[in-house]
UniProtKB/Swiss-Prot annotation:
Activates an alternative mTOR signaling through RPS6KB2 activation and EIF4EBP1 repression to regulate cell proliferation and migration. Recruits MTOR at the lysosome, essential for MTOR signaling at the lysosome. One of its GO terms (biological process) is response to oxidative stress. It comes from Homo sapiens. Interacts (via C-terminal domain) with MTOR and MLST8; the interaction with MTOR increases upon nutrient stimulation. The gene is MEAK7. Induction: Addition of nutrients and insulin induces its expression (at protein level). Disulfide bonds: none annotated. It is found in: Membrane; Cytoplasm; Lysosome. Keywords: Cytoplasm, Lipoprotein, Lysosome, Membrane, Myristate. A lipid is attached at G2 (N-myristoyl glycine). GO terms for cellular component: cytoplasm; cytosol; lysosomal membrane; membrane; nucleolus; nucleoplasm; nucleus. Residues 244-412 form the TLDc domain. Coiled coil: none annotated. This is MTOR-associated protein MEAK7.
Amino acid sequence: MGNSRSRVGRSFCSQFLPEEQAEIDQLFDALSSDKNSPNVSSKSFSLKALQNHVGEALPPEMVTRLYDGMRRVDLTGKAKGPSENVSQEQFTASMSHLLKGNSEEKSLMIMKMISATEGPVKAREVQKFTEDLVGSVVHVLSHRQELRGWTGKEAPGPNPRVQVLAAQLLSDMKLQDGKRLLGPQWLDYDCDRAVIEDWVFRVPHVAIFLSVVICKGFLILCSSLDLTTLVPERQVDQGRGFESILDVLSVMYINAQLPREQRHRWCLLFSSELHGHSFSQLCGHITHRGPCVAVLEDHDKHVFGGFASCSWEVKPQFQGDNRCFLFSICPSMAVYTHTGYNDHYMYLNHGQQTIPNGLGMGGQHNYFGLWVDVDFGKGHSRAKPTCTTYNSPQLSAQENFQFDKMEVWAVGDPSEEQLAKGNKSILDADPEAQALLEISGHSRHSEGLREVPDDE
């Protein structure tokens, strides 16, 4: 197998396998024979040809960025500026660097997609590139109908989650003096090749998003792109109409933090919109159901939550392990992992008089990093300055917050035990939920009306 030199010449060695290079060559032939570009040599293609091929699959500004990046590739080292059109060598080298290259090669292409001049670029230019890249991912997945059940962009105008995720990706960039790009005061700083290369190396989403944009935008080498662990399948039982707190960008960000074997599917266990504002319903739907993601939106529109690495159980002890984490989605995206200070990862309890009743993650009794009270709709996020378990700041707008929207999603494939529990009534599967319902004075209206399970 190995690398291919197919029709590329001696000055550049493509990193594509022969069958991949054949696809690249076929696309170049289609682009260079575009009938709407009569004045272009058959050995090159124009911006118009690329625009005609892509159509509406990518935003126009990303098509232009990709084209400019290609025509700025100088394989001889003698070019005095960008070429007028894109040659086959330039096209193959660009695709090879962007799809198969190492951090150095990818950073070279990113610099060329940002600026026509050699040398450092401003941080604000990198910010605009990153926002264009993130926005293009949502655009192309929506256009190709590959959102897997999640929403992309609903309201007209700029998508605020695009800017939030772009800011998160940029927050891991280290400037020359070691400072991080954490605010507008750094936007006039210079970013040289070393800064961009280090950023691409440490932030995998940059390379992944470039691959999505090119493979899905150009419809090239799609078999080499596995979207199943990038965008998990969204499952909501019985086809019920349901608008999640999360959009596809939020899900992609959280999903990337999960263990790999749990990234391909999210199944809705509980939604306050569908199941009501009830702590007993919450307990009944989420206990003994395996790893899951809980997310809520407070009255001030802050969106945050946590990942529980194992099944929730109602008991007075802390549970979970160091794979658990807390996260924020709005107003900023961030993940907060365990510190090793204590093992207070997860807590779920009710019906007790001397210890707290509710769902908590991190911190300690009455001082949780995230707390949902048994009086459903109330909670707290206490961190002065940070949560001891996860090093998270206050996640909610107010320390003591109120919320209307909460969701819990099971991630990955359920075990046979979890499937068996899922086929039973909530009250059969979780006697604790039944007890809580009775304690709260609610009768079981469905008692006597349900079908009897096979094992009874």
